[in-house]
Every structure is written in C-alpha cells, then in structure tokens.
Amino acid sequence: MAKDYLFEIGTEEIPAHVVPRSVKQLADRTRKFLKENGLKFKDIKTFSTPRRLTILVEDLAEKQDDIDEVKKGPAKKITQDADGNWTKAAQGFARGQGMTTDDIYFEELKGTEYAYVHVQKEGKKASDILLGMSDIIKAMTFPTKMRWDSNDFEFVRPIHWLVSLFGSDVIPVKILDITAGRKTQGHRFLGDSVVLANADDYEDALKDQYVIANAEERKDMIVNQMNELVKKNHWQIKPDRDLLEEVTYLVEYPTVFAGSFDEKYLNIPDEVLITSMKDNQRYFEVYDENGKLINHFIAVRNGNKDYLDNIISGNEKVLVARLDDAQFFYDEDRKYPLSHFVDRLKNVSFHDKIGSMAEKIQRVRMIGDYLAKRWDLPENVVTDFDRASELYKFDLVTQMVGEFAELQGVMGMHYARLAGEDEEVSVAIKEHYMPATAEGPLPETTVGSLLSVADKIDTIITFFGAGMIPTSSNDPYALRRYAYGIVRILLNEKWSLPFNEVLPEIINMLGGVTPAKLPKGDSEQEIADFIRDRVKQYLQKNKFKYDIVDAVLASSQQDPSQILAAANVLQLHHDDEEFKPVVESLTRINNILKKAKFNGKVDVDESLFVDNSETELYARVQNLQNIESLADLYQGFVHLQPVIDQYFEANMIMDKDENVKNNRLAQLYAVSELADRLGDLSKLVIK
C-alpha cells in the first residue's frame, strides 16, 4: 500500500531569491534518491516559505519490490579452473549479486554452459530507506552557507526543526541534535506550533496557523488583493514578475495594503521614485487611469489585517525618509552646470590599469567619429554624438547617482534635459548603457546606438590591452555582454563593421592620444574573434540551424551583418530542391582545391582555355564578382551550378600540362572565394 511522505526543513529566514531554487533542489535530490533506491512514487509536490523547505512525495511505496530473478554470468570455462576450483570471475559474479559461489549452477545456452544464480531478495522497507534523507540535507548546495553553534555542518540558514512523516508514522531523520518528528511551526508572530497526525494534514494545518505553504497560492492571494485595491481606487499597476516573485517568498501569510506620500515629491523624476519604492522597499508603484505615476504605493505585509493602520503609517514614514534624501540630492545636483560634473571626471578612475573616465570619453568620441564617417551618418547625428560623448558620463559624480547607482544614464538624461540639451543628446546619455542585459532593449536613436557601440568597443579594447581578458569560466567585467550588445546593435541598425579591418585602424588611431595600454598584433585578431563569437550566440538565440551556424562562422567573413545575411540566405533556401546540387557543386570545388593544395596565387589566363565550358564559367564568374547582395549571389550560384557540372564533364582539372592545370585550379579558386562569402558549405547537412 502506498502512502504520502512529508519532509519539512524548518529554518531561520532564508533570502527570498534562494527559496525557490532551494526547494526545487530538495525535490530533485529526493526524486533521484528514491529512484536509486527502487522506491516507486507518483509525484513530488513542493511547499516553501522563508522559514521552511518542504516536499510531499505522493503515493510512495511502503517497500522496494521483492527480487526473484535468474542472473546469467560468465561461461563455465571461465568460472572454474582445470581442477574445478572457483576462479575470481566466478567469485566476483556471485558477490555482485549478493550471493556466494555455493549458489552458482550451470545451464547450457546455444551449446555453451554458463553460470547462473537464482536471486531472491525481499525489498527493503521505505521507513528504513527514508532515514537517508539526512544525507540529502547534507548534500544540498547554496550560494552562501552558515554554521551555527559549534558544529561544522553548514546550511543556507540554521535549522530549527524537522518534520518527517510517512503517512501517520514518524521517520526519525536526524541532523545534528535535531530529530525529525510530527511537530511543525506556524507563523512566527500569529501562529503556534502544530502536531500533524498525518502527512496529508500539512497544508490545511498550517493555514490554521497563518502559513500559506503553497507558494503559488500565496502569489495568487497577492495578485487578487492587489487587483481589488486597484479596481476600488481606479488605479493602474505595471506587471513586475520579479518583484511579485520576491514578495511571494518574503512572506508566509500575505496581506496587501496601500500607502501614500506627499504629492510634492512627484517633481522628482519617476525613475527615482520607483527605485525608492521598488528596489529599496519592495513596494509596487501606482499609476492613475491615464498611466501617470501618482503619490500612492502598494505593499505586502507578512501577517493579517490586524493593526494594518500602524503598518501603513510605518511604511509611509520609511518611504518619506528616502524621498527626502532623493529630493535633497535632486535639488543639490541642479545647482551646478553640466560642465562642473564633466570637469570632475578627470579625477574619476575608469579602471586603475587603464586610466580616468575623462580619458575614456576622449577615446569614445574618436571611435564614434571614426564609425560615423565609415557609415556615412548624417551631419546632425555626428554633431549630436559629439556633444553626447562629451557629457555621457557626467552623472557618475552627481549625488543622486552616488546614492542610486542603478540610475546612471537615466539621471544624466534628466539633468541634460533640464540643462537645455537637445533631446537626441539627452536620450543618448541614457541609451549608451543599452542593452543592459544580454537580451535587453536596444537604443532607439541613432545617436544612442553610435554612442553605445563606441563606448563598448573602447571598453573591450582597453581591457584586452590591460590583459584583463575573459576566461571560459570568468568574465568579471561583463565583456561578453558588451560584445554581444555591439553585435545586436550593429545588426539592428544594419551597420557593416568587419572587425579584422576596423580594430587595427581604431587602435592605431588611439595610440597617439591615450596613455592606456592598447592591444597589438595577435591581440587585435583575438578581440575580433571574441566579438565574432558573440555572432554565434546571436544566431543560436535566433534559432538558426546548427549546421548553418557552423558554416557561416567557418568563412573568412568578419562582418556580423554579412554573417547574418549569409545565415538568412542559407536558412531561407535550405529546403529548396536546387539547394543540394548547388552545395554539392561548390563543395566539390573546395575539395579539389584542398587536395591540390592550391594557394590561389595564379591569375586566370583566358589564352589557356581549351574548351568552351572554360570560357562560359569564366564569364559567369566575372558577372558574379560585382554582386553585393548575398541573396542575389546565391541565386547566381543556382544558375552557375549546371555550368560548373558541364565544366567538370568537359575538362580534366589535373591536366598533364602544368599551366593548364593551374589555370583551371585558378578558375575554381575564383568560384571558391565567392562561395566563401556564404560560408564553408561543406559543413552543411544536406539530405
């Protein structure tokens, strides 16, 4: 007969972000433990709060299945020597089945005698196996661990109680001096301890003691109560899954309430108010029906509605203290012109191995001007970029950003607007940090995109130059994210940038104006390859077929926009009827060139043509040389494919005449160079 098994670890408050992954780990480890021990079960449910990690194993078998089976071993000639003594092979076979050599017997199978044993074993009781749950606790891992008392044992937080019930029976799992029983604890302030008669009583018994053990139920309670408040007051709130998740794991019994603050604080930029409420206090900001931020907030307490007025008043006082600070910083910062802050950047270090923030600004402007010229950007964009690049780091030395570091860029935008800067300049100051995460929003303005790319290129170049290069396991300065951001912006703006050409030019340009150590030689290509690797990340993220990704990245192409264009062409035509013969023809050419070890240093000489097919191929290839679009180039290959086949039919490539042979190889090399713009087509999986 199967019964439910309850296992609860009661602790001091666990950080909210650690709770969900910890209870999942407990469930995963338990699932593996039960399967390894041959205990059947239906499923594992999880319960979790800041003070408990709990699993409920549904329909757990009371014992392992009994074993009654015949095990086949090695051949008889291997199990006994000439004198009939048991060999080590026989002893090992018997021992592996929990038997002795006395239990071995022989039977013939297809003309050969083999050793057998008849294994009969009664399954172990679940109650005995479950004592091993203590090993699961000891094996659990966490971002940080704590010790308590004088023990060496570590856990995410000190353990205060354990519950271990198999149906109605206690399984006395033990950790340190704590032995599991049937007593659990209710809410720290509102509930009492409760003795569980049966594992199935857990959820309802805790509800009576003001603990909602089911995290999804707590989340639903929070959402429903918030919706009631919003509807009642004609407000709006913006969904914030991360904050909702956090408050769900901060409380055991949620009660939602609304508070307010003086309207005078609404003169502060919205982002400051939201940061003060959300990041510092875990409040949800509130908007009116028109989507405008208003002087109210919604919060969640860990308790019931008793004394709620006192709770609201206390939360309002804490928030007002923070808003007073924010108002002071805002007023103080606005007393000075932007030039005051820009001048102070001379004394702000970008990195002690690289130089000051002012020096970085100088480099970024040069990089941006170089890129703008390369991309032939409009004069007004260049003018706005130059001004934005002069200002874009000034808010780092403002008091507001000193208090709210996460608002760098945002406050720069607001202060620039207040100072009368052009909107494009102001917005670019904010956008240069974008994308802030790998898949975060990209800059929406051209100036912002240019500034972001220039800033990130400078960061990568100077960090590589200083020897601070990411390893496979360590990237403390987020250089991979910066490189991926560069790739995403370039592709979004459709800007061409072959890094193997551009980086040496940028580094050479910066060499005479910056004291920062810059990369040289192989390091330049190392940076180009580093950024190019992020193109692979982009292609994989956007669901390109793995063989297409391998093919386009195996080409000599260094321009992300061209690599993406090649991937799009190959993905688009991958299933076309003519795709296979085109790829096979081009791959055949590459194979011939590799086998001949041809280096391509011979020009095609038309006077050496023997057959009309050579003239035809030469003319067609000449026409393809001028095609810029990879989509058009592919179509050119479609039409070229029968010409290539005819060329092979009519000509012996490895002709006895050395000049003719090299001339034909040179023709094939010209085709191969064009095909390389699409990638190494031999890596494509063609069916």
From Swiss-Prot:
GO terms for cellular component: cytosol. It is found in: Cytoplasm. It holds the Pfam family tRNA_synt_2f. It comes from the Bacteria. One of its GO terms (molecular function) is ATP binding. Keywords: Aminoacyl-tRNA synthetase, ATP-binding, Cytoplasm, Ligase, Nucleotide-binding, Protein biosynthesis. It catalyses: tRNA(Gly) + glycine + ATP = glycyl-tRNA(Gly) + AMP + diphosphate. Its EC number is 6.1.1.14. PROSITE patterns: AA_TRNA_LIGASE_II_GLYAB (PS50861). One of its GO terms (biological process) is arginyl-tRNA aminoacylation. Its main location: cytoplasm. Belongs to the class-II aminoacyl-tRNA synthetase family. Tetramer of two alpha and two beta subunits. PANTHER family: GLYCINE--TRNA LIGASE, CHLOROPLASTIC_MITOCHONDRIAL 2, GLYCYL-TRNA SYNTHETASE. This is Glycine--tRNA ligase beta subunit. It comes from Lactobacillus helveticus (strain DPC 4571). The lineage of its organism: Bacteria, Bacillati, Bacillota, Bacilli, Lactobacillales. The gene is glyS.
